[in-house]
């Protein structure tokens, strides 16, 4: 708000709202649970596969498509595990990211060259040492509990 001649003038800032969907992709390997982490080319941060909702896609459709595009891995999504993260990447942008839990159907990945610098399968307990953002670390811990409960 600004003052002008004793009157309030409201400055309207147009907020951009973005929504992305993705998943914590996991597999069981030699009795251990491993999750798939991706390193983004532009920012260099480690996270989970995710991307923007396109057209009239559902959240689950977006998550499945983005995982396939970024990693080449097909998944079985668990719609009962749904975690959201909200943040503002820019002053005029509000972003919501919806994460599901996804069991990998195949394990060999093919990185999307334009966006992904590296992909790794890592032990779920070690993932918190690689993930860049605190919100992602919290979600991994919730995913670990959900996976163990479903076993």
Regions found by a protein language model. Give the residues of each.
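Short, glycine/serine-rich, charged loops/turns that create anion-binding
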Residues: 28-30, 42, 53
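Charged phosphate-binding loop/patch that engages nucleotide di/tri-phosphates or the phosphate backbone
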Residues: 3-9, 129-151
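Short small-residue beta-strand/loop micro-motif enriched in glycine and branched aliphatics
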Residues: 45-48
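Unchanged
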Residues: 51-139
